[in-house]
Curated annotation (Swiss-Prot):
Family per similarity comment: Belongs to the GcvP family. N-terminal subunit subfamily.
Keyword Oxidoreductase: yes
Protein name per the record: Probable glycine dehydrogenase (decarboxylating) subunit 1
Gene3D superfamilies: Aspartate Aminotransferase, domain 1, Type I PLP-dependent aspartate aminotransferase-like (Major domain)
Designated gene of the protein: gcvPA
Amino acid sequence: MKHRYLPQTEQDQKEMLDVIGVQSIDELFSDIPEKVRFKGAYNIKPAASETELVRELSQLAAKNKDTVSYASFLGAGVYDHYQPVIVDHVISRSEFYTAYTPYQPEISQGELQAIFEFQTMIAELTGMDLANSSMYDGGTALAEAAMLAAGHTKKKKVVVSETVHPEARAVLKTYAKGQHIEVVEVPAKKGQTDLAALEKAVCDETAAVLVQYPNFFGVVEPLKDIEPIAHKGKSLFVVSSNPLALGLLTPPGKLGADIVVGDAQPFGIPAAFGGPHCGYFAVTKKLMRKVPGRLVGQTEDENGVRGFVLTLQAREQHIRRDKATSNICSNQALNALAASVAMTALGKTGIKDIAYQNVQKAHYAKTQAETYGLLADVEGTHFNEFVIKLQEPVQEVNKRLLEKGIIGGYDLGRDYPELQHHMLVAVTELRTKEEIDTFIKELGDRHE
C-alpha cells in the first residue's frame, strides 16, 4: 500500500481507468478548462504516523476544560451526571452500535425490544399512556409537540412561557415560521410563568400552551394552576420536563398534561459539547396516531411467541410521504438505548435517590449562597438549579473560576437582557461539599 490512508495502488487506479476507457488521471479530467484548474501544491504536512497522530490529538484534547478535571456548576439543559459503567459496555455491542432503523422488524427483535423498554420507562416516568422511540433532542421534541397540537386542534397559535429554555423556544419559532403558526411568549415573574399574563394570552384560537417543569431557572412550575388555563378553549397542555426530576416530582401526566416532552440526557448520555442527545415524546392515548417518530409495539406471532414490531407506520414518510406526521428517519436509537440502560441500572429507587441528591446538594449550595447575599429575586421550589446575582459580568467571573479549576454557571444575560450579571447555577449528585463550598466562597468573597 503506497499511502497509509489512501489504499488504492497504482494497479487499482489503472484497472478503474481501463473500465471507464481513459488512459490516465489527467485524461479523466481533460474536460475541465486549464484556466480553472489549480496548479501547484497544497501547503499540507505529510501524513502522520499513528503514534504521531495520537500524540497530536491527545495534546489538542488536553486543552479542553472537561467535567472530569474541573468541578462543573454549568447546566442550562445539559448536566454533569454519573453514567453507570454498564452503559458504554452495552451500547458498544456491534449489533446495537452499528444498527440502523429496523425496517425489517422480524430480524431486529433485540433492537426493537430495547426501544420498547425505553418507551415503557419514559411513559411510566411521565405518567402518560405511551411514548415514542425518541426524538433528536428536547428542543425538537417541544417544537414537534406544538406542531402536533396545531394539527390536532386546527388552530394556528401557540402560547409558550419565557421560562422555557431559550434554545427550545428558538427551535419552536423556526418550526412555526414554516407552518405559519403564531408563537406568543408569556413573560416570567420572579422566575415563574406569570399566570395572569398566561390567562390573558390564551384564547379560543390557541392550539397549545407550553411550559417547562422544572423551568429554565430551576423553579418547579405550579402545573395544577396552569392546567385549567391551558385547557381553556380546548387547547392542548404541553410540558417539557427533566426526566430525572420526575423521580421526585408528580408526573405531568397526573397533572393534566396532554403531551410531555424533554431530553433524556440526564440518563447515561454525556454532555458531549451539547450533543448528540435524545429527546423523548409522550402523549395520552387520544393522540397516539399523531405522534411523530417511530413507535414500537408488542405483539405475538402465529405460535403465540412474544414479538416486537414497528406499529402505526402509516404515519411515517416511507409509507405515506404526503400525509406523514413523522419525518424523522434515523432517530436517536443509540442514545435512547443508553438512557434505557442507565434507567434500568438505577431502577426506581436509584432514580429517586439521585434526584433527591440533586435537590439536597442544590439547596445546600443555595443556602450557602444566601449567606453572601448572592440569591436573585426568584421565588418557588427548586430542583437542581437556582439563580444568583453578581456585581460584575458573569463572563469575567467564569474566567476566574476556570483558573481555580471550576466551570461556572450559565450567563442568563445572553438570553434575558434584564438579567445581566445573573448566573444560573446547577448542582448535581457529582458535586461534593468541598467543591460547593469552594465555588460559593469564590463568588461570595468578590461580592462582599
